[in-house]
Amino acid sequence: MDHNLQVTLVEPKRSYFTCPFSNLVLGGLKQMGELTHSYENLQRRYGINVVHVAADHIEGTSKIVVLKDGKKLHYDRVIVAPGVDMRFDLIENYGPDDVESMPHAWKGSASTLRLHRQLESMPDGGTVLICPPALPYRCPPGPYERASLVAHYLSQHKPRSKILILDAKEQFPKQALFSAGWERLYGHMIEWFNGSAGGLILRVDAKGMAVETEFGSEEGDVINLIPAQWAGRIARDSGLTDETGWCPVDQRTF
């Protein structure tokens, strides 16, 4: 590392939970603690200044990051990693409070732990609903990797259970590979329904643990509803997104 550079990381959380590999927790192959890391090495080994305060917005013309506590950080170069925010406005009867009973487990450790505990407490012979959104969203193959690892857990601990994937899409990434693997490893445990076959979620009943599609209502003992997403708020507030709500990317250079 060039010691002439002064690097500051603005991050409100005291520890970092890796969303990559979080499906291994749901599959019973890793513990939450194995995916949780502190920022101490960045400070101690590399001299990076870690500020545990959320960034509020970026003033691009003056090259300033304004923090939630009002402090301002001047920069020569800023790298923005806004993450994603959930869209709770696209499904009827669905809001932020419903993630308690229908966890998305798509960001943060608390939601992943909640889904993990629901899988542990569901009865053998129960039904898991996994409801992926339409593209684009973070990690397009993720819901299908998740279905695979949940099936791994269920096949060992609750083998009479089933997984229904109610998908807003007509097809999904790496579909042929996933479908072949599901059939070979788990038989008929996993069923996938595309949007035109009843996979598109129109509204939810969080108290009744049910989702409604144009073909009727589907109940689940566990419902992993993954909502539509867009770029994190700081990107939207700082003018970094386009009309889609996402940050445009030059695919030639990324």
Regions found by a protein language model. Give the residues of each.
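Glycine-rich dinucleotide-binding loop and its adjacent helix/turn
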Residues: 82-157
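Beta1-alpha1 glycine-rich phosphate/pyrophosphate-binding loop at the start
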Residues: 1-49, 134-176
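FAD-site-proximal beta/loop scaffold in flavoenzymes
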Residues: 89, 93-122, 219-254
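A Rossmann-like FAD-binding core segment of flavoenzymes
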Residues: 45-58, 62-65, 73, 151-251
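A conserved beta-strand/loop capping segment in the N-terminal third of enzymes
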Residues: 42-93, 126
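A general structural motif
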Residues: 4, 125-126, 160, 220
